[in-house]
């Protein structure tokens, strides 16, 4: 295992690129949110609070605009771009990402999420960083395996930059993109993600804590509860994946996608008139559940409306991340089940239930169980004592999911 100067230099450059991309997209996202929902950083409002304070019609209109911009934009990108290549395909070396098409595609994701698309923002900086890195490494005579490693590190560093989460982003790179834990890959991922986080912090974003609230108490009776919660979350994830697989397949370059997008986002806007927290990636919903500042009936409504909103956005051909939407689904399901448990069996901390539910739903839905355990602690800066119920719930959920999937596969 040799670290030549050129490879180390490229790792540093890629980290800086991802950091600048993450900072740029963060500022762009906030600027769009401030413009659309008429608030500024001086108001000291979260996006969720800003959306909740406007009238229902002022939530509907931006979503109609969002559907129009997204529908037209993605049809144009698919018709006239050089082809949208996903990160895993690029890392595998099967196809290269075109930097211009990729950056335009990623920027459109940020624009639509800023307006109110119910998908996440994290795919955009990952894709843009990987696309720019693909262009960069073409100009260097390096081995194919190093090229793949650099592209994967760029994608992971984009995640680190936008969420201020260097360790979990490095684990994500290894767990989901490279599928290896060798020292060369680990050192590259850790250095790249750490540098990207540093650059973003220095570029006006700062050391942001995504969830600034007190850690929920573990309470009592949480061992048995955590195990059963894992089974409930697993069932929820399996059903969510099934509903996604049933969505109609329409070629995204077809002009028919434009009216479909407008109608789908209009329906999302109608849902947002009653459940404003579904707009954006889902952070607003998590802020309510983690602090238990929500009734179980409203949590159930948020769970169902976010589920439908994500399916509508995907039907519309929209792109975006699934990390925070998955967290929001898990946190609301955790609140609902925790309430039922507290009534029927024994008291349980609903804040803990929501937090653990978010971690485990994310881990299963995005197939990154190790990443999600660390990711949520980095986002919240909660104590590592939360890892105990997380481990119990995640372990049970993974087992139950595999059992259900094997039965479904054998039934086909």
What are these model-predicted stretches?
Residues 1-412:
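Alpha-helical transmembrane segments and immediately membrane-proximal extracytoplasmic
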């Amino acid at each position: 295992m040799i670290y030549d100067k050129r490879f180390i230099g490229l790792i540093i450059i890629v980290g800086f690129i991802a950091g600048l991309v993450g900072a740029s997209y963060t500022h762009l996202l906030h600027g769009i949110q401030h413009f659309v929902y008429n608030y500024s950083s001086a108001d000291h409002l979260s996006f969720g609070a800003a959306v909740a304070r406007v009238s229902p019609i002022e939530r509907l209109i931006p979503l109609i605009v969002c559907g129009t911009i997204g529908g037209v934009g993605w049809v144009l990108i698919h018709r006239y771009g050089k082809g949208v290549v996903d990160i895993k395909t690029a890392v595998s070396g099967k196809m290269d990402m075109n930097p211009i098409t990729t950056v335009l595609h990623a920027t459109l994701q940020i624009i639509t999420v800023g307006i109110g698309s119910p998908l996440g923002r994290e795919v955009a900086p990952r894709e843009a960083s990987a696309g720019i890195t693909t262009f960069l490494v073409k100009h260097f005579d390096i081995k194919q395996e190093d090229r793949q490693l650099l592209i994967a590190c760029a994608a992971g560093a984009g995640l680190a930059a936008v969420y201020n989460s260097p360790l979990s982003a490095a684990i994500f790179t290894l767990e989901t993109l490279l599928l290896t834990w060798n020292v060369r890959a680990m050192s590259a991922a850790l250095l790249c993600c750490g540098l990207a986080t540093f650059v973003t912090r220095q570029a006006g974003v700062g050391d942001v804590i995504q969830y600034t609230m007190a850690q929920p108490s573990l309470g009592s009776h949480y061992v048995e509860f955590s195990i059963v919660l894992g089974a409930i979350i697993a069932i929820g994830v399996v059903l969510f994946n099934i509903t996604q697989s049933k969505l109609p397949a329409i070629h995204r370059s077809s002009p028919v996608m434009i009216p479909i997008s407008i109608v789908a986002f209009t329906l999302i806007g109608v849902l947002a008139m009653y459940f404003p927290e579904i707009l954006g990636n889902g952070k607003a919903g998590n802020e309510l559940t983690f602090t238990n500042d929500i009734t179980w009936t409203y949590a159930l409504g948020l769970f169902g409306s976010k589920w439908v909103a994500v399916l509508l956005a995907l039907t519309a051909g929209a792109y975006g991340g699934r990390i925070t939407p998955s967290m929001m689904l898990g946190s609301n399901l955790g609140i609902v089940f925790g309430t039922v448990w507290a009534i029927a069996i024994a008291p349980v901390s609903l804040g803990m239930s929501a937090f653990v539910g978010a971690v485990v739903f994310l881990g299963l839905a995005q197939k990154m169980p190790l990443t999600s355990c660390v990711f949520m602690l980095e986002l919240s800066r909660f104590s590592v004592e939360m890892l105990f119920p997380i481990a119990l719930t995640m372990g049970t959920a993974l087992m139950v999911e595999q059992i259900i999937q094997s039965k479904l596969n054998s039934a086909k």
